[in-house]
């Protein structure tokens, strides 16, 4: 009844929404890509453009600890995609996507049982929450067992609680007011 995914069906379309504290950040693949400036050329109010949003992209990137997968942790598929891009002359356009995941630059597949949760290094984030580093177990969409995924409950909501906010699961917010 009160799971962390809420499924909604709308005729020809169904959606999955995050239903726990942290919302949609609990069930996404952590991809954090900035829209390119040209994306705002049509269909957006004039006041909303890349220049206006850039400081917010930067702030969010810091809060979510956005980073790229270290080169020593690329999968064979990632290497093949890079080789393919190079082969067709588009190597300069190939990039791994920025993700809201904390990677350990020393993690590698050569160690015994590399995907073991025991290889995750714990650390305390700026909001005082204990997290781990990614061990590439592949459970990003389902919930990271080592808390390397930087979900909103570990950063923005934790910062709000640290500032005195009261986070109440299973409640609907109707208004927000200063006290």
Regions found by a protein language model. Name each.
Residues 50-173:
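Conserved redox-cofactor binding core of oxidoreductases
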Residues 175-179:
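Conserved beta-strand-loop-beta-strand element in the redox core of flavoprotein oxidoreductases
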Residues 1-72:
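Redox-cofactor-proximal catalytic regions of oxidoreductases
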